[in-house]
Amino acid sequence: MSKNHVCMSSCLKIPSACLIFFCFYTIIILHKRYTYVFKRKIIIIFGLTLVSLLSHAQYDVSFSHYFDMEPSFNAASVGKQPKLNVSAAYAIDLAGFKHNPQTMYAGADMPFIFLKTTHGAGLQFMNDKIGLFTHQRLALQYAVKMKLFGGQLSTGVSAGMLSESFDGSKLDLEDSSDPAFTSSKVDGNALDLAVGLYYTHRNWYAGISAQHINSPLVRLGETNELKVDATYYLTGGCNIKLRSPFLTIKPSFLVRTDGVAYRGDITTRLVYTHEKKMMYVGAGYSPTNSVTVLVGGNVHGIVMGYSYEMYTSAINPGNGSHELFIGYQMDLNLQKKGRNLHKSVRIL
């Protein structure tokens, strides 16, 4: 998992003695994660290096297991199967570095029938911490589904709250009396909206979505503000059965952009299934960014996956990213009212 951008206004002043350390640390972190634009004056800490970083950063987090976490970027994918779906992921970026990015995600979704129409509902929470910044999102998701061309088309919306905070009290600066610099902890909230379309047809699927369509503006204290740009996603994948009835190849892709920066991921997994057992190995590639290896399987009905991402970009800190994924699914019988809706546990 690697991460990317934020647009923020602020004003800081860094003593020259700390400049070299902060510049080196910031270049490494921000190349993978965040870029900040400031309202009153540009922070000396970032210097001219931010000019190039501005074109390579995005706000949203990238997960290696995106194929099993589609509700995290497309609300229309909630309830895509007649199952209760629960997933969680924890990722450590730039392992070994102090204040390195750490992200936790948890979500659940399920379908339901209302007025003879299939709908989907979901809930998700994300906590993303990098350095002195903490980004949180709590959102509700809804989707309505209809049959189309032999498949199923789903239209979804999401409404949630972004919570942003910056703990300036932990910075060690000589000139903390500068009124333009935030030396205390500040936080703020803003409404966050998203929309999406998702289509499934037998052994393939495709989806398109837009996150942060209202471009949330979070005010942090009296002088700082953080603006999140809308981000657009395109995803797809399929199942390719091999001669062996136990083996399936599952290629998938995810492309996203905010109109300035972009990231693409291509992943292929070889999946072995037999009765209730499942194991997989896979590899992913993000052009100009990283190469990822994945491995996983199910244990007592719970799917566990691990991935390691190795950076291939010009600015390479030497340590990669670790990601752990956990998923659980339970079959639902949507046709029987007033009865126990679950039948059995299935693997992802």
Predicted segments, located by residue:
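Subset of outer-membrane beta-barrel
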Residues: 58-348
